[in-house]
């Protein structure tokens, strides 16, 4: 059934839709299956995403037609279609009238992902109008609150030096806590790796008690505040709340030094919102493990990394992993810095829409995945600043002189970049950074040709 007369209006102007403020706009790359027209398939897509189905139904009235999702732009050659969704379509909480990402996903990338006439469709960007934007929780905390705990300026406080305890699984409570203590002697921040929780060989409560003790000892020994991000992810919100409360009680006077890690992609919006609403005074660390199945550039379905990041900010993530933009081991490219800008800026330009975030607090980019001291300057050059949480697992624990030296090498690389000094030159007076060149020699050869001669290190 051709539904284009009802669900397509190519006379609508995007500028007018934005000015009107009553539509969420979504841009997709869509390809119909052979034998199906582009506009007709786009119309069916919009119908299935809003008020329609594959046949006309007798219960449809004029009000229903007034909230149809409408295809307002198509470029068949580029495979681009844009759809305007009236804000009235989206579900809202009965307890407080707030909007929900679950409803946004259900409409915009729900049944339309399995339609028989659609070969593939991937959302590349979306726009939220100002009034509707205020119905999302947004972040309660961000990197500024970490800087405050660390005693830094709350504006442009610089990189938070972090790590992930490795191996990601297999450490019992004491070795895990000992590794935390060692890193904290040189670094700022430690996170649970995403699968770490309450394994039989590492009971959650035993581990957290020992980590809290390691934090106290490291702070006493260094005179500096330390930070820990604890994984509270679970299927059951009650379990998440129980874990979170136990951690706050266990860390006691250092409760403000704790973040809560939530595996937001695999556990979903409910898990993120459970943390955001039950622990608004705690940094909400959104880990995106699993997202590549949907967001990868190789995938032609689902949604993009940018869409994922924008949803995380709406949900209330204090910080989210953004990848390393091609400078680490994970898939990515330098032009993905727009992802970080969309998280941290009050207004940012996406591939299709300019999003004004109004008064919504910024979300912090968390950088991880194959980073070490030698890779940081190039990353910061590309991003244009260093106001990120950076977590290096192998980059710290793979240092030839151990995790303390690894942490210090990361800090020294940041110092060199901030001062505009070449890394090789800075390494001449900083043994930990010099050790990073030896520890990650293949990176050194690629990024800093001639480093061995300048540092007088034999091959």
Curated annotation (Swiss-Prot):
Q: Which reaction does it catalyse?
A: 2 (2R)-3-phosphoglycerate + 2 H(+) = D-ribulose 1,5-bisphosphate + CO2 + H2O; D-ribulose 1,5-bisphosphate + O2 = 2-phosphoglycolate + (2R)-3-phosphoglycerate + 2 H(+)
Which residues are substrate-binding? 111, 168, 288, 321, 368
Keyword hit for Metal-binding: yes
- A Pfam family reported for this protein in Swiss-Prot or TrEMBL: RuBisCO_large_N
What is the cofactor note? Binds 1 Mg(2+) ion per subunit.
Q: Which residues does the record list as N6-carboxylysine (modified residue)?
A: 191
Keyword Oxidoreductase tagged: yes
Q: Where is the site labelled Transition state stabilizer?
A: 329
Q: Which residues form the active site?
A: 166 (proton acceptor), 287 (proton acceptor)
NCBIfam families, alphabetized = PRK13475.1 (NF010002)
**Protein name (database record):** Ribulose bisphosphate carboxylase
Q: Which organism is it from?
A: Paramagnetospirillum magneticum (strain ATCC 700264 / AMB-1) (Magnetospirillum magneticum)
Q: In the record, what lineage is assigned to the organism producing the protein?
A: Bacteria, Pseudomonadati, Pseudomonadota, Alphaproteobacteria, Rhodospirillales
């Amino acid at each position: 059934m051709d539904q284009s007369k009802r669900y397509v209006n190519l006379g609508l102007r995007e500028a007018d839709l934005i000015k009107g403020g009553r539509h969420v706009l979504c841009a997709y790359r869509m390809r119909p299956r052979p034998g199906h027209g582009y506009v007709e398939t786009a119309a069916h897509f919009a119908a299935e995403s809003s008020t329609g189905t594959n046949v006309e139904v007798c219960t449809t009235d004029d009000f229903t037609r007034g909230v149809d999702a409408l295809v307002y732009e198509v470029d068949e050659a580029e495979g681009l279609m844009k759809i305007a969704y009236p804000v009235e379509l989206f579900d809202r909480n009965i307890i407080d009238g707030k909007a929900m990402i679950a409803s946004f996903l259900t409409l915009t990338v729900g049944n339309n992902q399995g339609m028989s006439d659609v070969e593939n469709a991937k959302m590349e960007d979306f726009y939220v109008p100002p009034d509707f934007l205020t119905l999302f929780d947004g972040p309660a905390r961000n990197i500024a609150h970490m800087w405050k705990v660390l005693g830094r300026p709350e504006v442009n406080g610089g990189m938070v030096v972090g790590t992930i305890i490795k191996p990601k699984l297999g450490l019992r409570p004491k070795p895990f806590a000992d590794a935390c203590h060692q890193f904290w002697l040189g670094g700022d921040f430690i996170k649970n790796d995403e699968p770490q929780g309450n394994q039989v060989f590492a009971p959650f409560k035993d581990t957290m008690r020992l980590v809290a003790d390691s934090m106290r000892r490291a702070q006493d020994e260094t005179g500096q505040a330390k930070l820990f991000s604890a994984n509270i992810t679970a299927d059951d919100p009650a379990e998440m709340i129980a874990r979170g409360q136990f951690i706050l009680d266990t860390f006691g006077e250092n409760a403000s030094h704790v973040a809560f890690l939530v595996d937001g992609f695999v556990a979903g919006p409910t898990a993120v919102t459970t943390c955001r609403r039950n622990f608004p005074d705690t940094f909400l660390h959104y880990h995106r493990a699993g997202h590549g199945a949907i967001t990868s550039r190789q995938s032609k379905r689902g949604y993009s990394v940018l869409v994922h990041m924008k949803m995380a900010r709406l949900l209330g993530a204090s910080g989210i992993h953004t990848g390393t933009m091609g400078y680490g081991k994970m898939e990515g490219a330098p032009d993905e810095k727009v992802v970080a800008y969309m998280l941290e800026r009050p207004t940012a330009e996406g591939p299709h829409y300019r999003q004004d975030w109004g008064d919504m607090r910024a979300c912090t980019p968390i950088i991880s995945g194959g980073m070490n001291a030698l890779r940081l300057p190039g990353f910061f050059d590309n991003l244009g600043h260093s106001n990120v949480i950076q977590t290096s697992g192998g980059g710290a624990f793979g240092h030839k002189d151990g995790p303390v030296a690894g942490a210090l090498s990361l800090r020294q690389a940041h110092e060199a970049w901030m001062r505009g000094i070449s890394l090789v030159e800075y390494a001449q007076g900083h043994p930990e950074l010099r050790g990073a060149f030896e520890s990650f020699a293949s990176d050194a050869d690629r990024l800093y040709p001639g480093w061995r001669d300048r540092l007088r290190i034999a091959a």
